[in-house]
From Swiss-Prot:
Polar residues bias locations: 27-43, 54-67
GO-annotated cellular components: chromatin; chromosome, telomeric repeat region; cytoplasm; meiotic spindle pole body; nuclear periphery; nucleus; nucleus leading edge; shelterin complex
Superkingdom: Eukaryota
Oligomer status and interactors: Interacts with taf1 via the Myb domain, and ccq1.
Originating organism: Schizosaccharomyces pombe (strain 972 / ATCC 24843) (Fission yeast)
Keyword DNA-binding: yes
Protein name: Telomere length regulator taz1
Single GO molecular function: telomeric DNA binding
SMART domains: SANT
């Protein structure tokens, strides 16, 4: 059994419709100009011949059936079916090596070694990503990601407005419209044909397996995540409930997981929902669990998955859990446990969570990891030059070093070892000190009388190793201390925010929106952070306000509104709009329920009511009561903080329009 750490988020979304929305993430520009290796024509031909002869035996259990592969990968509604047959086809798995050919002129190259290495790659993956098309995607990645972000926001906005009317993929396609669906699939087809994405999405486990692709896309992870987000979102239009692309993305997320966090638990819950939807129809026959897993991945076998997987896949026995889930569901198909809108919200939440997880960061501090850092690369090159130059010194220079071979020559002061474990200096300076120490040690080792210096060199080499270990330990302790300070600071901020509310139940509802006084902070930083700064300043000024003559002194602390007060606020806004001072004046004259409130309090309550309707996708219901609610503004920071899609403020109603509505 596998221990899922945190699966409550996706489960709540699947059980409650329309509660999860997503935020738009800003994609940053990044470039990558790293050269990649290529293989020769002879190796390509050898691998093709081997793949053709062994494909029948090695891949018979893992390829999709002929009858299933003859169907289109993506099915649309009736009004766009002809377009699907003409432009969209299921991706055909290619067993050939589509790589750029280049004649190798390097001396002493062993062709047998290259052939065996490529044979090993052919045993892991079904189709090699064309390196030329991958390089083309590197150049266009940012533009493609921006276009994908726009299409995602457009589709999500339509779903947010019409979530009640969308009950299946067909109705979703109808809401989008024929032209929109056609544009989405043409854009997805371009990713396949132009950039070589034969499996209709991005596989981060594949990129991590091969250093050539990792070097290409190391700085382009966010744009790639945006492209993957788009491919997963349009797969929701698949009315066959197969959802091949979504299964691919979920399995790739599990394969590339390195740390045991709560994210992979959400992935397992979503995969179970996809399996239930796949086997929930009568038209889907029983299928082998291994074949079901491999049908949506570019890998040849389950053993190949153990080669490309991360730490979580093996430690948590993900493969066994997936096979047991597939077997139980295929033997006794369960009834769909979630409606289609809840399923869409769960998919969007999962894709958003996956965008925030880094998969292409090199976390190791080994020499291999430092090779990708420009400053470290210069230090290592200088170190190699010094070591190679010192070993080729003449006998005269060696004799000169011999005369200086004393205990002071190898002292920690001379070698600079007393400064290496200083955590205040940078890594580049530390590597420079190590380079200088090794330069002196190797120079002394080139002398003729090695018997006198080898023992000393060994001793101080041991001292150098201890200094490096001491530095690593000091840096680890320093990082842990900084992390503890950060956690303590966050705890203080949370306690300060919690103290602003008198009742625990009102914390989430009565969070104040951004006021005009916070505009300057909002321009310089994030609006959410500006809101928190405003709360802290408000708490600091609370003592001063008590000493002033405030007419609403008795209702300084927040309290829960009664139904009578909320109904009165609805009536006042319907009659008088957003004239808050006028509403308070009328309430005082008529001795109404809102007579004790101030203009700011009723304005905040009106914003909170509208935000609640926005979160539940019920704005049209609110506008049906009164069009004056369109003039109630909800700040962008409040929407970002509570994950509500931000809608621009509607211009005030014209006088003639208001008169016609009231009449």
């Amino acid at each position: 059994m596998i221990s899922v750490q945190s699966t409550e988020t996706i489960q709540k979304v699947l059980e409650n419709e329309g509660d999860q929305q997503f935020d738009k993430e800003v994609v940053q520009n990044s470039d990558s100009n790293i050269e990649t290796g290529q293989i020769s024509d002879s190796l390509t031909k050898a691998v093709e011949e081997r793949a053709e002869t062994e494909s029948s035996s090695n891949l018979s259990n893992f390829t999709t059936s002929e009858s299933e592969s003859s169907k289109p990968a993506y099915c649309f509604n009736s009004h766009s079916q002809n377009m699907a047959e003409g432009s969209i086809s299921i991706p055909v798995i290619s067993h050939s090596m589509n790589v750029e050919n280049e004649v190798s002129t390097a001396e002493g190259q062993d062709s047998r070694t290259g052939e065996s290495e490529n044979d090993q790659n052919a045993m892991i993956v079904r189709s090699i990503w064309d390196i030329e098309k991958a390089s083309l995607l590197v150049n266009d990645c940012q533009n493609i990601a921006n276009m994908a972000e726009q299409k995602v926001m457009m589709v999500s906005a339509i779903f947010s407005e019409s979530s009640k009317d969308i009950v299946n993929p067909e109705s979703f396609s109808e809401r989008l419209g024929k032209e929109t669906v056609k544009d989405l699939y043409e854009f997805n087809e371009q990713l396949t044909t132009k950039y070589g994405l034969e499996f209709r999405t991005i596989f981060f486990s594949y990129i991590r397996k091969y250093d050539a692709y990792w070097c290409l896309f190391e700085d382009l992870e966010k744009p790639l995540k945006s492209i993957q987000f788009f491919t997963g979102l349009i797969d929701l239009l698949d009315n066959t409930n197969k959802h091949l692309t979504l299964r691919s993305i979920v399995l790739d997320a599990l394969l590339s997981a390195d740390e045991e966090d709560s994210f992979y638990g959400d992935a397992l819950v979503l995969f179970e929902e996809l399996v239930i939807r796949y086997f929930g129809t009568d038209s889907n026959p029983s299928i082998d669990a291994s074949e079901f897993i491999l049908s949506c991945l570019p890998y040849t076998s389950l053993d190949a998955l153990n080669v490309v997987c991360g730490q979580v896949w093996k430690s948590q026995k993900i493969c066994d859990f997936l096979k047991s889930t597939i077997g139980n569901t295929s033997n006794s198909p369960l009834q769909l446990r979630a409606s289609f809108p809840a399923f869409v919200n769960a998919v969007i939440h999962f894709l958003l969570e996956f965008k925030n997880v880094r998969r292409l960061e090199r976390k190791d501090l080994s020499v291999k990891g430092m090779l990708y850092d420009s400053d470290s690369q210069q230090i290592l090159n200088r170190l190699r030059e010094r070591v190679s130059g010192s070993t080729a010194q003449s006998a005269d220079e060696a004799s000169g070093h011999e005369s200086d071979a004393s205990e002071d020559t190898f002292s920690e002061r001379t070698l600079g070892l007393n400064s290496i474990d200083n955590t205040e200096i940078s890594e580049v300076v530390s590597l420079g000190l190590v380079s200088s120490a090794l330069d002196k040690i190797t120079g002394l080792l080139s002398a003729d009388n090695l018997s006198e210096t080898v023992s000393q060199a060994r001793d101080f080499s041991h001292t150098l190793s201890k200094s490096l270990k001491s530095r690593a330990k000091s840096l680890s302790q320093k990082e842990a201390a900084n992390r503890s300070k950060l956690i303590a600071k966050r705890g203080d901020n949370l306690r300060r925010e919690a103290s602003l509310s008198s009742e625990q139940d009102d914390l989430s509802e009565d969070f104040p929106p951004v006021r005009e006084s916070d505009e300057q902070e909002s321009r310089s930083g994030g609006r959410s952070s500006a809101m928190r700064v405003s709360i802290e300043r408000s708490a600091a000024r609370s003592g001063t306000r008590r000493s002033q003559g405030n007419p609403y002194e008795g209702y300084r602390t927040r309290r829960k509104w009664t139904d009578e007060e909320e109904n009165e606020l609805y009536e006042m806004i319907s009659q008088h709009g957003c004239c808050w001072s006028k509403i308070i004046h009328i309430q005082k004259l008529e001795n109404g329920p809102l007579k004790t409130f101030g203009p700011t309090q009723i304005k905040d309550k009106a914003r909170l009511i509208k935000a609640r309707f926005m979160k539940q996708n019920r704005l049209q219901e609110l506008y049906s009561k009164s069009l004056n609610w369109k003039n109630v503004t909800v700040g962008q920071a409040y929407c970002e903080l509570h994950k509500i899609p931000y809608i621009e403020a509607t211009p005030p109603l014209l006088r003639e329009e208001l008169v016609n509505y009231q009449s």
